Amino acid sequence: MCPHIGIELKIYYEAYGCTLSKAESGLYVNRMLADGSSIVKTPDEADISIINTCVVIKPTEDRMIQRISELSHSSKVKVMGCLSTVNGGSLADENIEVLTPKEFRSFYSGQLDDVEIREPSIMEGIPINQGCTGSCNFCISRVARGKLISRPVQKITGQVRMQLARGMKEVRITSLDTAAYGRDIDIRLPDLVRSITSLEEDFKLRIGMMEPRNTSEILSDLLDSISSNKVFKFLHIPVQSGDQRILDAMNREYSVQDFMNIVSEFRRRYPDSVLSTDFITGYHGEDQESFENSMKLLDRTKPEICNITRYSQRPFTPDYDRNPPPSNAVKKWTKEMSDFHRAIIKEKLESQTNSVKSLLITEKGKNETWVGRDDAYRPVVVPGQLHLFDRISCEIVGNGPTYLIGKLI
C-alpha cells in the first residue's frame, strides 16, 4: 500500500505534464478521497501537497524542482510523475516524499483498477496502459515508465462507468501510446474502443496520443471502431520530423510515408476531422535540408494542431551526449515552423465560418462564455446561459487564434 492511502488528510494538488501522467495522479488522489481525505485550495491549508511532475525537457524539470521546493515550505510534499522516477534522488528532504517506480507500479497494477471516481474534475483521462513498446533515442518518458503494461478492458470500462455516473459526458482514454494498448494481453485498441462505445450512456470519447508504428498495424480496424457517433474524430499522432534520416537517427521505427498513409486514410474516412501532431526542432544531425523536409511535411498534411518543441538533451537516453545544432539555427527553425503553422490554423479556422455545429459543452469560458467541442474536437467559444455538458447547436461566426466562435441557434 502506498503511504497516505487509508488516512484522512487535507490534500493540495497540482498536476503538470502529459495527459497520461495527470490521469494517473488523478486516480491516486481519488483513491485518497475514497478513504475520507479532502481537497483544499491552498498548500497552507494542506496536510500534504501532491504534485505531478514532468521532465520531458530540461527547463520543465527545473521548474518542477523549484515548485516542489516552494510547496515544501507549506506542507509535506508527495512527488509523482516522471521526475520521481528519473531524478527523485535529487529531492532528498524530510518534508518531501517520492513515489518510487516500484511503489507506483505495484499501486498501478492493483489498487488503481478499482478506484471510485469521487472527483471527476481532476481526472484528465483514464490511463489504459503504462510504458510503451518504442525505443526512441531521445525519449526520457520511456526511461521513466518502462515496458508496456496494459490494463484489463473490464477495469477501464468500469472506471468509464464511474465517471458517467458522476455526470461526466466527455471520456478520455490516455497513455504514452494508446495504439500499443493490449499488445501484452492479446487484445488491441479497437476492441477497447468498441467496449467503451457499447455502453448505453450519452457521452463522447476522445482517444489519446498514438505512435505511428503501432497505429499502422491496427489502422483499418481502428478507423472502423471510431465510426461510432460517440467518438470524437480526432487523431493525435506525433511524427517528430519530416526527414527520414532524422527519423532513423531518432530510432522512431517508421517512415515519413507511413505517417502520411495514416493521415491520408484517416482524412479519407473522416473528412471533417482534426489532426494533431508533434515536431522536434534541433535534433542532433538536423540541418537546413532536413528542416525543410519537415516544413514540406507540415505543408502537405496541414495539421489543425501542431506541438513544436526544441530538442532537449535528457539524461539516461542514448542521445544524451550528442550535440544538437547551433542554438541560433534551432531558434530560427522553431520560429519559422511556428509561424507557418499559425497561418495553417488561421486558414483552417476561417474555413469553418457560417457552418453549423453540434456541440458538447465541456468547460466554463471567460467573460460569460462557455467552451464546447464539435464532433472533431474543435473548441468553440459560445456566449449564453448554458450549463456544463449541455448539448447545443450553433452557427460559427468567427474565430480566435486557436478556437472558433459560435452563436446559439
Task: Spell out what each predicted region is.
Residues C2, V98-I126:
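N-terminal [4Fe-4S]-dependent radical SAM core
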Residues C2-S106:
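Cofactor-cradling patches in redox/metallo enzymes
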Residues I68, S72, V160, P190-R194, ...:
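Generic structural signal for well-ordered alpha-helices
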Residues K78-G81, V86, A165-D287:
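Conserved SAM/AdoMet-binding glycine-rich loop
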Residues S121-Q154:
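Canonical Radical SAM [4Fe-4S] cluster-binding loop centered on the CxxxCxxC motif
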Residues I156, I173, I207, I237, ...:
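Conserved, mostly hydrophobic/aromatic
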Residues K233, R245-I361:
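A structural motif corresponding to the C-terminal lobe/cap of the Radical SAM core domain
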Residues D321-I409:
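Terminal RNA-binding accessory module
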